[in-house]
């Protein structure tokens, strides 16, 4: 199968698209990643097209993608009334495998140590989408260990640099956030929250 993954918005790598890339490649599918919503002149016909949008102001780009690919599956938090996860789409309870190769120049490890939020900010979808705060991953779960260096064209140890996407790091139980801080300190990680 030919699969198109489209990052509609956002500057950081999209975890949902990274999961889909991993899953489809594990199934033997050809995966094409782009941030363009319009079809390129030399793009093939696709068996399945995915789009992911985070922000509600991306509705116009979503519409453009759907004009180009009417059967595209568009997910993300851009629309509060329809929130589905990659796992729901794939019919799996959990799926935590990521294909970083669609972002060859991003060398940090990316993920969540907790999901949910105890705060109820009027503009935010997190409490509705994810519920109450809970711990989900250790630093060891998030750190990818090895990355393909596109400049040197070889695998190398991944830099000890993390982007934690947690919405409420200190909202998880204290013993968990303290354990994560110990892991960060002991592993000498640089962290961006």
What is each PLM-predicted segment?
Residues 1-71, 80-81, 171:
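A short, structured N-terminal alpha-helical element that caps or precedes a catalytic domain
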Residues 1-4, 30, 107, 120, ...:
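Residues that mark the start of a beta-strand
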Residues 6, 52, 75, 127, ...:
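Conserved residues at the C-terminal ends of beta-strands
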Residues 38-47, 63-66, 142-155, 182:
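Short amphipathic alpha-helix with an adjacent loop that forms part of the alpha/beta core around
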Residues 46-49, 122, 160:
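Conserved acidic residues
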Residues 72-99:
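Ser/Thr/Gly-rich flexible loops in soluble cytosolic domains mediating phosphotransfer, phosphorylation
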Residues 104-152:
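Canonical Radical SAM [4Fe-4S] cluster-binding loop centered on the CxxxCxxC motif
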Residues 146-193:
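Conserved SAM/AdoMet-binding glycine-rich loop
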